[in-house]
From Swiss-Prot:
Name of the protein in its database record: Na(+)-translocating NADH-quinone reductase subunit A
Native organism: Klebsiella pneumoniae subsp. pneumoniae (strain ATCC 700721 / MGH 78578)
Function: NQR complex catalyzes the reduction of ubiquinone-1 to ubiquinol by two successive reactions, coupled with the transport of Na(+) ions from the cytoplasm to the periplasm. NqrA to NqrE are probably involved in the second step, the conversion of ubisemiquinone to ubiquinol.
Entry superkingdom: Bacteria
GO biological process, one term: sodium ion transport
Pfam families: NQRA_2nd, NQRA_N, NQRA_SLBB
EC number(s) reported in the record: 7.2.1.1
A GO term for molecular function: oxidoreductase activity, acting on NAD(P)H, quinone or similar compound as acceptor
Reaction(s) this enzyme catalyzes, per UniProt: a ubiquinone + n Na(+)(in) + NADH + H(+) = a ubiquinol + n Na(+)(out) + NAD(+)
The organism's taxonomic lineage, starting at the top: Bacteria, Pseudomonadati, Pseudomonadota, Gammaproteobacteria, Enterobacterales
Enzyme class, broadest EC rank: translocase
Swiss-Prot/TrEMBL keywords: Ion transport, NAD, Sodium, Sodium transport, Translocase, Transport, Ubiquinone
Length: 447
């Protein structure tokens, strides 16, 4: 077991009840184009077309063969584009249950499938896009082989669902998914679970189970990869979440695209925080109807630390997100707030009284309590960064755009979510995720 000592479990109110409850009916689903780093779509449908679940909606021009498929059957009601015609979302009004049929396999035959057969089924069904590379967090190139594949079977994000019961309820499909993944690599398939996890005993020796304990980010793929299979420009690994592993298993066992997801609804503004079963890409306007407290709220697809604001063309469940978080828009001004004790405010430093209430849950809002200012190195980053890097120096180089120094300090191992806590504790209010993405893009372009 690998024990993480540095990090932070954000004490936010609205922790979801870890029981699956009925969810409001969803009438629309969508694929969000901006979730896929560097993707340029070649559209295969237009508004008004009727599509089946699993039918191709668009293909990546940069990586021919990588297809993005419909998560439900129905009619394409909108194709939203932003500046410079960037694809924002392809929206489908759900109608019927028509689905594209794929090849089915017996469970005991999966371990003998040729790599090309597995790859072609994943590409044709759109499940290939569940995989992401490290470094760069992009969809893998067809035909490439990773040094290892990581399946994340734990989640330490604030307000997240507990993965173990969900996996155990679909254990046969999960094991089948792991077997399929072993056909894509000559290395290990690492299943990362929390301390005391009940997963284990896969018949293939290529699958190994690892345990991590400690505060967030102990449950992030970047943390697991750093300790088990560090990457470089010449070494690439892939990763995916546990529900995508289940979906891959069901694809090969049942011959149909599996798009059900169990997600957590949580946050201070959710009236009944709980787990719900919904559809990949579900409309969050439909899903949250009657679920929120009155007032101006911000809906976030994903974690409050690293998720995406869900509004307008983006008001749908993200491809890689297993939770929806809702907090209040912090527009109120507080007179002389900086001199008040701050009983209702949490701080990682001893600047507010709330720092000393270890069991208290706080009603966070979107208020950042100030704007950008100088980056002050007072040790905050070191408190929340468990990886073997120098965070203050790395973050400075990211802001300066120094690709050589950032690469030497380990930025290739990171994704935006790995720096989310650094953004949260930063006295200067800087957003380090976009700075990291800019540097990674330049490193990739310059080779």
């Amino acid at each position: 077991m690998i024990k993480i000592t540095k990090g932070l479990d954000l004490p936010i109110a609205g922790m979801p009840l870890q029981q699956i409850s009925p969810a409001p009916a969803v009438k629309r689903v969508a694929l969000l184009g901006e979730e896929y780093v560097g993707m340029r779509p070649a559209m295969a449908v237009k508004e008004g077309d009727r599509v089946k679940k699993g039918q191709i909606l668009f293909e990546d021009k940069k990586i021919p063969g990588v297809c993005f498929t419909a998560p439900a059957s129905g009619i394409v009601s909108a194709i939203h584009r932003g500046e410079r015609r960037v694809l924002q979302s392809v929206v489908i009004d759900i109608e019927g249950n028509d689905a594209v049929a794929f090849t089915r396999y017996a469970a005991d035959a999966l371990a003998e499938l040729p790599r090309d057969t597995v790859q072609q089924q994943l590409l044709a069904s759109g499940q290939w896009t569940a995989l992401r590379t490290r470094p760069f967090s992009k969809t893998p190139l067809p035909g490439s082989t990773p040094a290892a594949i990581f399946v994340n079977a734990m989640d330490t994000n604030p307000l997240a669902a507990e993965p173990q019961p969900i996996i155990l309820a679909e254990r046969a499909a999960f094991d089948a998914g792991l077997t399929v993944l072993t056909r894509l690599t000559d290395g290990k398939v690492h299943v990362c679970q929390p301390s005391g996890g009940k997963l284990g005993g896969h018949p293939l020796g290529q699958v190994c189970f690892n345990q991590f304990s400690g505060p967030h980010p102990a449950g992030l793929p970047g943390t697991h990869i750093h300790f088990l299979e560090p990457v470089s420009l010449n070494k690439q690994v892939w990763h995916l979440n546990y529900q995508d592993a289940i979906a891959i298993g069901k694809l090969f066992l049942d011959g149909e695209l599996y798009c059900e997801r169990i997600i957590a609804l949580g946050g201070p503004q959710v009236t009944s925080p709980r787990l719900v079963k919904t559809t990949l890409g579900a409309s969050l306007e439909d899903l949250l109807a009657g679920e929120l407290q009155e007032g101006e709220n911000r809906v976030i697809s994903g974690s409050v630390l690293s998720g995406a604001r869900a509004h307008g063309p983006h008001a749908f469940l993200g491809r890689f997100h297993l939770q929806v978080s809702v907090v209040k828009e912090g527009r109120e001004k507080e007179l002389f707030g900086w001199v008040m004790p701050g009983k209702e405010k949490f701080s990682i430093t001893r600047t507010t009284l709330g720092h000393f209430f270890k069991r208290k849950r706080f009603h966070f809002s979107t208020d950042t309590n100030g704007g950008e200012r100088a980056m002050v190195p007072i040790g905050n980053y070191e408190r929340v960064m468990p990886l073997d890097i120098l965070p203050t120096i790395l973050l400075r180089d990211l802001l300066a755009g120094d690709t050589d120094s950032a690469q030497a300090l380990g930025c290739l191992e990171l994704d935006e979510e790995d720096l989310a806590l650094c953004t949260y504790v930063c006295p200067g209010k800087y957003e380090y995720g976009p700075a990291l993405r800019s540097v990674l893009t330049r490193i990739e372009q310059e080779g």
